[in-house]
């Protein structure tokens, strides 16, 4: 059975409810982070979706040197711990350097490896050594079958709890495209798959000093992923995306999230009751 046990009360994979990894791209203020986590959690509870709060304490791969990056690791982890304690949900956040793995694992239930860094062996091994669930985003430059090598590295490091995320493939300059064959291909490695609906509509560097995006297409891609078969969805969400300091053009407005998720859930339920064609 393809399933990853993230916490005592959360499993992702076969026989489990759809899971949503969601939150603002980067930690902004402490109050705003808690507000967003609470708002998304209420929607997920209403719809019967498992929820993991996502936000990055540091966006180390911003397009411009002048772009907002977030907070020092210690401050970001303190805020994420408040989300866990006060909202009562697991959290996922990125690590960019090997030395971050152990301290981040003390708070985060899932360590996320950014797409640009998915082949960095030392980073993968450090994450594997923590024993936490690891969500690896497939690089925009990788074929889905090449993620088998990433999985092999993690397994060699002792990782047993792995998630693999599709987030689009480079399609010329400043553009991404999704090859949905990647979902069953990566799932064949024996681990649950996640579809990142909002980064898949990103236009990397498309605004010169920042990335653009086409958030209006994210719901369509998410429905397609649900139709093919996916264990979790990744969606960045913001109260006011047009004012967000990072990835605003991609993010789903909070007030639209419930309406975005409802048809995705219907498709997911149908596919869960439909045999997969050989």
UniProtKB/Swiss-Prot annotation:
The keyword Transferase applies. InterPro entries: Aldolase_TIM (IPR013785), DAHP1/KDSA (IPR006218), KDO8P_synthase (IPR006269). Gene3D superfamilies: Aldolase class I. GO terms for molecular function: 3-deoxy-8-phosphooctulonate synthase activity. One of its GO terms (cellular component) is cytoplasm. It catalyses: D-arabinose 5-phosphate + phosphoenolpyruvate + H2O = 3-deoxy-alpha-D-manno-2-octulosonate-8-phosphate + phosphate. Keywords: Cytoplasm, Lipopolysaccharide biosynthesis, Transferase. Pathway: Carbohydrate biosynthesis; 3-deoxy-D-manno-octulosonate biosynthesis; 3-deoxy-D-manno-octulosonate from D-ribulose 5-phosphate: step 2/3; Bacterial outer membrane biogenesis; lipopolysaccharide biosynthesis. It is an enzyme of class 2 (transferase). Its main location: cytoplasm. It is found in: Cytoplasm. Its EC number is 2.5.1.55. One of its GO terms (biological process) is keto-3-deoxy-D-manno-octulosonic acid biosynthetic process. Belongs to the KdsA family. HAMAP family: KDO8P_synth. This is 2-dehydro-3-deoxyphosphooctonate aldolase.
């Amino acid at each position: 059975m393809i399933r990853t046990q993230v916490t005592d009360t959360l499993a992702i994979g076969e026989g489990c409810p759809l899971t949503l990894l969601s939150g603002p791209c980067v930690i902004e203020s402490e109050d705003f982070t808690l507000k967003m986590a609470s708002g998304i959690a209420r929607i997920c509870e209403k719809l019967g979706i498992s929820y993991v709060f996502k936000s990055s304490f540091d966006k180390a791969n911003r397009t411009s040197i002048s772009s907002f990056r977030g907070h020092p690791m210690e401050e970001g982890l303190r805020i994420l711990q408040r989300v866990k304690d006060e909202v009562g949900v697991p959290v996922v956040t990125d690590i960019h350097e090997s030395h971050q793995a152990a301290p981040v694992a003390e708070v985060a239930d899932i360590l996320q490896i950014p797409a640009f860094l998915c082949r960095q062996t030392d980073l993968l091994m450090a994450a594997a050594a923590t024993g936490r669930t690891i969500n690896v985003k497939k690089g925009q430059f990788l074929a889905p079958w090449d993620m088998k090598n990433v999985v092999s590295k993690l397994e060699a490091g002792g990782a047993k709890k792995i998630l693999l995320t599709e987030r689009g493939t480079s399609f010329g300059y400043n553009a991404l495209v999704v090859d949905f064959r990647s979902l069953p291909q990566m799932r064949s490695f024996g681990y649950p798959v996640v579809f990142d609906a909002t980064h898949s509509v990103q236009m990397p560097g498309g605004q010169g000093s920042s990335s653009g995006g086409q958030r209006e297409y994210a719901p369509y891609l998410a429905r397609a992923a649900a139709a093919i078969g996916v264990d979790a969805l990744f969606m960045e969400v913001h109260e006011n995306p047009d004012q967000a300091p990072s990835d605003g053009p991609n993010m789903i407005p909070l007030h639209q999230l419930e309406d975005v998720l409802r048809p995705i859930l219907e498709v997911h339920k149908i596919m869960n009751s439909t045999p997969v064609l050989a």
